[in-house]
Amino acid sequence: MRVKIKCWNGVATWLWVANDENCGICRMAFNGCCPDCKVPGDDCPLVWGQCSHCFHMHCILKWLNAQQVQQHCPMCRQEWKFKE
Protein backbone atom coordinates (compact mmCIF):
# COMPACT_ATOMS: atom_id res chain seq x y z
CA MET A 1 0.00 0.00 0.00
CA ARG A 2 1.35 3.43 -0.96
CA VAL A 3 0.09 6.73 0.32
CA LYS A 4 0.54 9.87 -1.73
CA ILE A 5 0.09 13.29 -0.14
CA LYS A 6 -1.69 15.59 -2.56
CA CYS A 7 -1.94 18.66 -0.37
CA TRP A 8 -0.45 19.71 2.95
CA ASN A 9 -1.31 22.84 4.95
CA GLY A 10 1.09 23.55 7.80
CA VAL A 11 -0.11 25.47 10.81
CA ALA A 12 2.12 27.02 13.45
CA THR A 13 1.73 29.02 16.62
CA TRP A 14 4.24 31.02 18.62
CA LEU A 15 4.62 31.66 22.31
CA TRP A 16 7.02 33.81 24.31
CA VAL A 17 8.99 31.84 26.88
CA ALA A 18 8.81 33.81 30.12
CA ASN A 19 8.63 33.01 33.83
CA ASP A 20 5.20 34.61 34.12
CA GLU A 21 2.18 34.74 31.84
CA ASN A 22 1.47 38.47 32.22
CA CYS A 23 3.50 41.66 32.09
CA GLY A 24 3.96 42.99 35.63
CA ILE A 25 3.41 46.57 34.45
CA CYS A 26 0.41 46.50 32.10
CA ARG A 27 -0.97 43.10 33.26
CA MET A 28 -1.56 42.04 29.63
CA ALA A 29 -0.64 38.50 28.57
CA PHE A 30 2.82 38.06 27.04
CA ASN A 31 1.39 36.19 24.07
CA GLY A 32 -0.70 39.29 23.38
CA CYS A 33 0.68 42.78 23.08
CA CYS A 34 1.16 45.80 25.30
CA PRO A 35 -1.43 48.63 25.34
CA ASP A 36 0.73 50.68 22.93
CA CYS A 37 0.84 48.01 20.21
CA LYS A 38 -1.91 46.75 17.97
CA VAL A 39 -0.43 43.37 16.99
CA PRO A 40 1.63 40.94 19.09
CA GLY A 41 4.93 39.62 17.83
CA ASP A 42 8.31 41.07 16.92
CA ASP A 43 7.07 44.67 17.11
CA CYS A 44 6.17 44.15 20.76
CA PRO A 45 9.09 42.07 22.11
CA LEU A 46 9.72 40.92 25.65
CA VAL A 47 12.80 42.07 27.53
CA TRP A 48 14.41 40.52 30.59
CA GLY A 49 16.31 42.24 33.34
CA GLN A 50 19.34 40.82 35.11
CA CYS A 51 16.97 40.20 38.02
CA SER A 52 15.14 37.72 35.68
CA HIS A 53 11.87 39.69 35.56
CA CYS A 54 10.31 40.05 32.14
CA PHE A 55 8.18 42.84 30.64
CA HIS A 56 6.92 44.12 27.31
CA MET A 57 9.69 46.35 25.93
CA HIS A 58 7.39 49.38 25.64
CA CYS A 59 6.11 48.95 29.20
CA ILE A 60 9.54 48.80 30.86
CA LEU A 61 10.87 51.69 28.76
CA LYS A 62 7.95 53.88 29.90
CA TRP A 63 8.50 52.75 33.49
CA LEU A 64 12.22 53.54 33.37
CA ASN A 65 11.63 56.95 31.77
CA ALA A 66 9.20 57.83 34.58
CA GLN A 67 11.81 57.06 37.28
CA GLN A 68 13.33 60.27 38.63
CA VAL A 69 16.74 59.25 39.97
CA GLN A 70 17.56 55.57 39.73
CA GLN A 71 15.90 53.06 37.49
CA HIS A 72 14.55 50.06 39.40
CA CYS A 73 12.71 46.87 38.46
CA PRO A 74 9.00 47.40 39.24
CA MET A 75 8.77 43.91 40.75
CA CYS A 76 11.83 43.52 43.01
CA ARG A 77 13.16 47.13 43.15
CA GLN A 78 16.69 46.06 42.16
CA GLU A 79 18.58 48.43 39.90
CA TRP A 80 17.31 47.69 36.37
CA LYS A 81 19.85 46.38 33.90
CA PHE A 82 18.85 44.69 30.67
CA LYS A 83 19.92 41.07 30.44
CA GLU A 84 22.49 40.58 27.70
From Swiss-Prot:
Pathway membership, UniProt: Protein modification; protein ubiquitination
GO cellular component, one term: nucleus
Transmembrane parts of this sequence: none
Positions bound to Zn(2+) 3: 34, 37, 44, 58
Record keywords, A-Z: Cell cycle, Cell division, Cytoplasm, Metal-binding, Mitosis, Nucleus, Ubl conjugation, Ubl conjugation pathway, Zinc, Zinc-finger
InterPro entries, per the entry: RING-box_E3_Ubiquitin_Ligase (IPR051031), RING-H2_APC11 (IPR024991), Znf_RING (IPR001841), Znf_RING/FYVE/PHD (IPR013083)
GO MF, one example: cullin family protein binding
Keyword Ubl conjugation: yes
PROSITE patterns hit by this protein: ZF_RING_2
Positions bound to Zn(2+) 2: 51, 53, 73, 76
Keyword flag Cell membrane: no
Start-end of RING-type zinc fingers: 34-77
Chief place where the protein resides: cytoplasm
Post-translational modification: Auto-ubiquitinated.
Gene3D superfamilies: Zinc/RING finger domain, C3HC4 (zinc finger)
Binding site for Zn(2+) 1: 23, 26, 56, 59
Pfam families assigned: zf-ANAPC11 (PF12861)
Protein's GO biological process: anaphase-promoting complex-dependent catabolic process; cell division; positive regulation of mitotic metaphase/anaphase transition; protein branched polyubiquitination; protein K11-linked ubiquitination; protein K48-linked ubiquitination; protein ubiquitination; ubiquitin-dependent protein catabolic process
Localization of this protein: Cytoplasm; Nucleus
Self-association state and partner proteins as the record states: The mammalian APC/C is composed at least of 14 distinct subunits ANAPC1, ANAPC2, CDC27/APC3, ANAPC4, ANAPC5, CDC16/APC6, ANAPC7, CDC23/APC8, ANAPC10, ANAPC11, CDC26/APC12, ANAPC13, ANAPC15 and ANAPC16 that assemble into a complex of at least 19 chains with a combined molecular mass of around 1.2 MDa; APC/C interacts with FZR1 and FBXO5. Interacts with the cullin domain of ANAPC2. Interacts with UBE2D2.
Family that this chain belongs to: Belongs to the RING-box family.
Free-text domain note: The RING-type zinc finger domain coordinates an additional third zinc ion.
Function: Together with the cullin protein ANAPC2, constitutes the catalytic component of the anaphase promoting complex/cyclosome (APC/C), a cell cycle-regulated E3 ubiquitin ligase that controls progression through mitosis and the G1 phase of the cell cycle. The APC/C complex acts by mediating ubiquitination and subsequent degradation of target proteins: it mainly mediates the formation of 'Lys-11'-linked polyubiquitin chains and, to a lower extent, the formation of 'Lys-48'- and 'Lys-63'-linked polyubiquitin chains.
The protein's name: Anaphase-promoting complex subunit 11
Organism: Bos taurus (Bovine)
